[in-house]
Amino acid sequence: MNIIVVGLSHKTAAVEIREKVAFSPTQMEKPLHALVSIPDITEGVIVSTCNRVEIYATTRDIAGGIARLKRFLADYHNFPLETLEPHLYSYHGEAATRHVFRVASSLDSMVVGEPQILGQIKTSYGYAAEYKSSGIILNRFLHKAFSVAKRVRTETKIASSAVSVAFAAVELAKKIFGDLSDKTVMLIGAGEMCELAAKHFINTGVRGVMVTNRTFERAVKLAEEFDGKAVNYEDLFDQLHKADIILSSTGAPHFIIKPKDIEDVIRRRKLKPMFFIDIAVPRDIDPKVNDIENIYLYTVDDLNGVVATNLEQRKKESEKAEAIVEQEIGQFFKWLSSLEVTPTIVALRSKFDEIRRAELAKTMANWKDLPPEGEKRLEALTNAIMNKLLHQPTSVLKRSDQGNRNDLYVDALRNLFDLETAPHEEMELGELEE
């Protein structure tokens, strides 16, 4: 069985493309069921964040499986595959494992070392477990990814100087305004990103924080944490003129802020500048808002310049983290190989022993005067011949350094000898790695 990955990220696609194929985090049951209904896709997990959309799956047909996942991603969102495909990447086998381990360890993030991606993958895995689209292989695979991320976090300093996208937004605000002590921040949304942004803005010393959310209780809860003010979502545009910096991160499927809304707001501010940071995918703010005088709009892609300065200081720690990833890849593949190999060896030996016993019984039936000692010797002889015949193929199968060749050997033996292997028991999900 092969692990395959198909996806796109901030490295391969602009936000205008990523938002077209994003999955709603609150509506994962339907796409997950559709995913594992694809022919020859046996398990599947969907990861959808502001910076990436990825599908992890298992299949016996690597090329066909990858092609089907690409088609699924395009068709599910009614997006032309020919437009989407140039932005997609795909991996299988060791490369797929390396990619996911690196993503979970935040080595592939826009901001290397940021902790949010691990939580996002855990949430995605939780949905797959809940809706039963993951099985023994992806369960073990993602638990391994979580443990790799934990090793990276505890054995390197990659996260000690890391900044999140939310912190990068604060740094960008400081570049625009300089001193933020007389600035008021409006957070639209009450999720993790907004909470992180609130912490960073408070630490920077802003004058105040306002929070609005479609669920007012969540806005109140977040505002109370930072001695801020909760605003009813219906009153957003009545209160927006009081904010100098607006950070938006909702799960809305459409623009919630449009040019006509802001034209009235900026007039009430007597054209005092406003700084909008849209880190939602799909985007919350119509890009045409940026055409309005004294309005400055930035998206997640614009944060690249802010975070680039952190790359060099993390380079050494990243190298340590990459070494950990490589160690763990070998361990995981040893397990994955044994998952296919052990039942095949058992079935092969059982098949040979069945034939040996049948032929030995025929011989015994026709050899009426064979003494008991002779029977024992024939039993030992046929056992020895069987073991000699099976020694070489068994030894080759047990080697853990063969990569995808093991799959070829396993499939060949199963087909040549018509082997039936016992199904594996499901791995207990247990607790996710902290």
Swiss-Prot record:
Binding site for substrate: T49, C50, N51, R52, S109, E114, P115, Q116, Q120
Reaction(s) this enzyme catalyzes, per UniProt: (S)-4-amino-5-oxopentanoate + tRNA(Glu) + NADP(+) = L-glutamyl-tRNA(Glu) + NADPH + H(+)
Domains (record comment): Possesses an unusual extended V-shaped dimeric structure with each monomer consisting of three distinct domains arranged along a curved 'spinal' alpha-helix. The N-terminal catalytic domain specifically recognizes the glutamate moiety of the substrate. The second domain is the NADPH-binding domain, and the third C-terminal domain is responsible for dimerization.
Catalytic residues (UniProt): C50
Enzyme class, first EC level, given as a word: oxidoreductase
UniProt pathway: Porphyrin-containing compound metabolism; protoporphyrin-IX biosynthesis; 5-aminolevulinate from L-glutamyl-tRNA(Glu): step 1/2
EC number: 1.2.1.70
Function description: Catalyzes the NADPH-dependent reduction of glutamyl-tRNA(Glu) to glutamate 1-semialdehyde (GSA).
UniProt site (Important for activity): H99
InterPro entries assigned to the protein according to its UniProt record, in alphabetical order: 4pyrrol_synth_GluRdtase, 4pyrrol_synth_GluRdtase_dimer, 4pyrrol_synth_GluRdtase_N, GluRdtase_CS, GluRdtase_dimer_dom_sf, GluRdtase_N_sf, NAD(P)-bd_dom_sf, Shikm_DH/Glu-tRNA_Rdtase
Binding site for NADP(+): G189, A190, G191, E192, M193, C194
Family as reported in the entry's similarity comment: Belongs to the glutamyl-tRNA reductase family.
Family annotation (PROSITE patterns): GLUTR
Molecular-function GO terms, alphabetical: glutamyl-tRNA reductase activity; NADP binding
Record has Oxidoreductase as a keyword: yes
Record has Oxidoreductase as a keyword: yes
Domain of life, per lineage: Bacteria
Gene encoding the protein: hemA
Other facts noted in the record for this chain: During catalysis, the active site Cys acts as a nucleophile attacking the alpha-carbonyl group of tRNA-bound glutamate with the formation of a thioester intermediate between enzyme and glutamate, and the concomitant release of tRNA(Glu). The thioester intermediate is finally reduced by direct hydride transfer from NADPH, to form the product GSA.
Protein name, as recorded: Glutamyl-tRNA reductase
Keyword tags: NADP, Oxidoreductase, Porphyrin biosynthesis
Quaternary organization: Homodimer.
GO biological process assignments: protoporphyrinogen IX biosynthetic process from glutamate
Annotated source species: Geotalea daltonii (strain DSM 22248 / JCM 15807 / FRC-32) (Geobacter daltonii)
